[in-house]
């Protein structure tokens, strides 16, 4: 039996929050030196378990603050779980924040080489791919422009183009495609489908429930850090829609 591309077992993630009531920086410093500051845990995710098979698309839906982005960062190996186990097999290309992994002071060309290298590709290979990556993103004329001059849509196109061009085993997409226009969203969906046909796994966060129904094999509904429902996308989306009226 083939091991799943992603395996999460009873994973929880907590952030540590200070309960200091210091009114000034000096008071806070004194409390820190005297170890008078107490902390509490804020659980962003609690007891999450899931699997994603090779070539499967898992959609994650839920209200703002449900823990969706935290889950994506945990799967992308950005945030380790506080408790439980997370295993992601193979190469991972995360698109979890607009512009993440890019330097705004560097040009698109320089960022493509750097980003691809971070994802495991050789620099020389990425240099050979820069023109094609920029062309797919409709950024041919802007390849030598620093990213600080890019719009959010241009950043999204560049990020998706370079991430998918590296042919990852797992693609993690957290709503960043929503900033693109309809043509780009359709183009991105087609490329994702091609990747899936070739065996890549995708975890997708989206508030566009029509997209979820169109491309997802399974869906989970997150609410307050808990998996409220998992299963067929139609069932999960219907239950979520009923809950929000």
PLM regions: where:
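Pre-NBD coupling/linker segments of ABC/ABC-like ATPases
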Residues: 2-44, 233-245
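Conserved ABC ATPase "signature" region
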Residues: 26-34, 113, 125-142, 161
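The feature captures the beta-strand-to-loop junction immediately N-terminal to the Walker
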Residues: 61-63
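H-loop/switch region of ABC-family ATPase nucleotide-binding domains
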Residues: 206-207
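A short, surface-exposed alpha-helical micro-motif characterized by mixed small hydrophobic
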Residues: 212-214
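Conserved ABC ATPase "signature" C-loop
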Residues: 224-225, 240
